[in-house]
C-alpha cells in the first residue's frame, strides 16, 4: 500500500500550472474500498461482504488512458494516482483530478477516465 496524495496539494499544483488560465473547473474522484461486494452492487447478486481487496495496475495502460483524456475538448489538466497491494475497508484505491474549461466537459472526462482505469488498467481481487 502506498501513501495517499494530498488533494489540497494537487489542486495547488494544478492552479499554478501553465494551463490554469484555461480551467474554469477542477473535479476530483477518490475511490475507496467498500464493504459491499462488486457483484452485489453492480449486478444485484447475493454475495458476502468483503474485508478488503488486493489491487494492482498496469502503469503503461494508465499513462495511455491519461494521454487520451488530453485529446478531449476543453481538458487541460489531468492527474491520476492508483494504490497497490492489499487494501482494507476505507483505504484509498485511486485519486483522479481533471481540470477543464466547462463543467459538462470536465464531468464527462472524469467519467471517461475513471471508467477506463477501472475497466482496462487495474486488477481487483476482493478478499473475504
Locate each region found by the language model.
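N-terminal, polar/charged subdomain of small-to-medium soluble alpha/beta proteins
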Residues: 1-93, 99-128
Amino acid at each position: 500500500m502506498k501513501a495517499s496524495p494530498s488533494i489540497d496539494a494537487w489542486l495547488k499544483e494544478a492552479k499554478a500550472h501553465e494551463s490554469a488560465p484555461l480551467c474554469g473547473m477542477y473535479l476530483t474522484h477518490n475511490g475507496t474500498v467498500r464493504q459491499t461486494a462488486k457483484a452485489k452492487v453492480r449486478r444485484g447478486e447475493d454475495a458476502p461482504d468483503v474485508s478488503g481487496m488486493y489491487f494492482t495496475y498496469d502503469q503503461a495502460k494508465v499513462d495511455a488512458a491519461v494521454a487520451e483524456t488530453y485529446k478531449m475538448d476543453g481538458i487541460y489538466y489531468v492527474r491520476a494516482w492508483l494504490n497497490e497491494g492489499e487494501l482494507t475497508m476505507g483505504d484509498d484505491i485511486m485519486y483522479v483530478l481533471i481540470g477543464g474549461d466547462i463543467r459538462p466537459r470536465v464531468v464527462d472526462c472524469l467519467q471517461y477516465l475513471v471508467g477506463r482505469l477501472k475497466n482496462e488498467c487495474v486488477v481487483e481481487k476482493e478478499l473475504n
